[in-house]
Amino acid sequence: MTNSSPVYDWFQERLEIQAIADDVSSKYVPPHVNIFYCLGGITLVCFLVQFATGFAMTFYYKPTVTEAYSSVSYLMSDVSFGWLIRSVHRWSASMMVLMLILHVFRVYLTGGFKRPRELTWVTGVVMAVITVSFGVTGYSLPWDQVGYWAVKIVSGVPAAIPVVGDFMVELLRGGESVGQSTLTRFYSLHTFVLPWLLAVFMLMHFLMIRKQGISGPL
């Protein structure tokens, strides 16, 4: 018989946390699982690093065409460890994309996309698209020459789509040309819309993996 604290007993009575803990800690792991099955988890870690460092940078970044570049320069040169925070953000972004690509290849080569895991694969593909969108929107935020022309090119791509192309370009840019409205939209996408979308699909992805388990060997 084990002694438990009153606090533990209080939560146990209402939430049955011991059953939850047992379920989490006793999940069966197939013997064929190796280090390559950790690529999805590494991608998640990279996202968490992205979230933490990105949140830290929002304290100093100013999303205006006149102050964006100077605020990034201030972060890099005057803020204590600001250069490190931004560098870690950039490095982990590259690492996240690399781990995502390797994870997709691993799942495809081991047949993890087959029945009954089709929806798990679909949510993974959606998350891959969102991850690339993070890169596109984040690249523009310093609003330097590279960022400006990248936005101009990327936001003009939908113009090739019949009927709705011009509307989509104007929606992305916030007008006929690239400017303050464009930067505001990309900043909103990068810091609010895309993180929430990724979190929702990530939760769905993990719940389905938890329910169906890890796919077997080929």
UniProtKB/Swiss-Prot annotation:
One of its GO terms (cellular component) is plasma membrane-derived thylakoid membrane. Heme b 2 binds at residues 89, 190. The keyword Transmembrane helix applies. Pfam families: Cytochrome_B. It is found in: Cellular thylakoid membrane. SUPFAM superfamilies: Transmembrane di-heme cytochromes. Gene3D superfamilies: Cytochrome Bc1 Complex, Chain C (1.20.810.10). One of its GO terms (molecular function) is metal ion binding. It comes from the Bacteria. The keyword S-adenosyl-L-methionine does not apply. The chain crosses the membrane at residues 35-55, 93-113, 119-139, 189-209. Binds 2 heme b groups non-covalently with two histidine residues as axial ligands. Binds one heme group covalently by a single cysteine link with no axial amino acid ligand. This heme was named heme ci. Heme b 1 binds at residues 103, 205. Heme 1 (or BH or b566) is high-potential and absorbs at about 566 nm, and heme 2 (or BL or b562) is low-potential and absorbs at about 562 nm. The 4 large subunits of the cytochrome b6-f complex are cytochrome b6, subunit IV (17 kDa polypeptide, PetD), cytochrome f and the Rieske protein, while the 4 small subunits are PetG, PetL, PetM and PetN. The complex functions as a dimer. Belongs to the cytochrome b family. PetB subfamily. This is Cytochrome b6. It comes from Prochlorococcus marinus (strain MIT 9313). The lineage of its organism: Bacteria, Bacillati, Cyanobacteriota, Cyanophyceae, Synechococcales.
